Amino acid sequence: MANAQIRSPSVAIIGAGMTGILMAIRLREAGISDITILEKAEKVGGTWRENTYPGVACDVPAHMYTYSFRANPQWSNRFAHGDEIQGYFEQVAREQGLSEQIRFNEALEQCHYRDGKWHLTTSKDAQLVVDFVVSATGILHHPAYPDIPGLESFGGDSWHTARWNHDVDLSGKRVGIIGTGSTACQVISEISETDCDLTVFQRTAQWVVSVPDKEYSEAEKTRLSRDPSRLALLRRRYAFVLRNTFSKAVTGSKLPHLLVSWLAKRNLRKNVRDPELRAKLTPDYPVGCKRLIISSRFYEAMQRDNVHLETTAINNISEQGVVTVDGITHELDVLILATGFKPFDFMRPMDLRGRDGVTIDEAWEKKVQAYRSICIPGFPNFFLMLGPNSPIGNYSVIAMSEVQTDYVLKLIDLWRSGELPTVEATEDAKQRYNAYLKAGMGKTVWVRGCQSWYLDADGDPAMWPYSWEQWVHEHEVPVLDDFVHQPPAEVEPLRPAA
């Protein structure tokens, strides 16, 4: 088709985190310049902007937690700290000149599809009309607060880890932390080294694998800077190890699961000396059923004299502290909630309405599902990045976003050339895709009896049950038959006379 016939779309990107930055860069490389990025906060960064708790770091090796086109030889640690990751995304955004296209401190409040376009209203009451909307709002960005009676009655300082209060000095304080997931383990490992008195309230023990957090010297950084091939090799090695150990261990490969299970159990047995404490820290579910924690510091932290593990269930929160079901009040000055996020909210509470005014809540009333994690029937030209059943878990989310971004660009190209009048997966394609996902879940570790944020309200894992290689392969070429080929009528069709 001649270039004169290629349509040039307007695109709105919601969020200037890792995926939003990536999408803007890729769109411009594809010759699409009419791009608006709406960011609710004052700067880019997403997860790494919002999570500033002590000890925050990525549990994926830093040299593979970068864009494929922008390596970073300057990481200080194998597991990069949050401030360095935030700095990396800010630097990439500057280098790419994205600041002029990002509208900071402006959230998207309404997103309605009508007359073949998306009509947007922002928190500043600005109006936009665009062809495509890309929701790059991320997965874990709506803090989940525990449903514990009396939570609001606590008389001391209290906050969620994603809303860390840096004005409060924990030194000399009686601190309680609810939760033992990945974030909690990082916080506990860090603040246990202060002179606070720390009580950890554990509902569920976690499996932990120890991987040393290597520090890179300036000489090593210089060598990596001068030799891009060495840097690329390091990235490939980390990716190979993760794909063939952790990723395969949770999706049904027997030998990788045996290896990872042995590593986790050996770590606990070797590094927790007290048999009573070790018993409390021993999970009652298979390794990998919940997100595996990567930490070389957690068990050491839990054995410090100023750290106390409380496994008795919480009854309520009082003004003085946490009251357990045995009637004991654990008096506290500070209460920290490491209780995770709401993983199924995605772009909500945005007022998102597709064709015929159908809301996203109505579309997802029975089940939060999408076609290939990205396309929602009834919401034409709308892409949900890192949606349900993306392969989230002990692998680089950046790699996932790059695969999805390339796939979205191929779909937009089909629209530009006129092969697809709109980009909208059919309901049948969505149902078949999710049946395919469900068929693969039986061999995964996520269905083996534990409760985790991976599971939806029906207890089904919102994960990818097959290999990483298979996921990449299935996003290489869009299946045209899975998409609507005739634009649905925007008005009620004429009916024959009686």
Per-segment meaning from a language model:
Residues 248-256, 260-320, 325-351, 434-498:
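C-terminal catalytic lobe of FAD-dependent flavoproteins
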Residues 3-8, 12-13, 18, 22-29, ...:
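Rossmann-like dinucleotide-binding core of oxidoreductases
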Residues 9, 123-132, 325-334:
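Core beta-strand elements of the Rossmann-like FAD/NAD(P) dinucleotide-binding domain
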Residues 113, 130-132, 136-143, 181, ...:
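Glycine-/small-residue-rich beta->alpha transition segments that form the dinucleotide
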Residues 77-141:
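Feature captures the FAD/FMN-dependent oxidoreductase FAD-binding
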Residues 3-13, 18-102, 202-203, 270-276:
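Beta1-alpha1 glycine-rich phosphate/pyrophosphate-binding loop at the start
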Residues 334, 338-415:
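Glycine/threonine-rich phosphate-binding loop and adjacent beta-strand/alpha-helix elements that clamp
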Residues 49-58, 149-150, 297-299, 354-381, ...:
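FAD-binding beta-loop-beta segment adjacent to the flavin cofactor pocket
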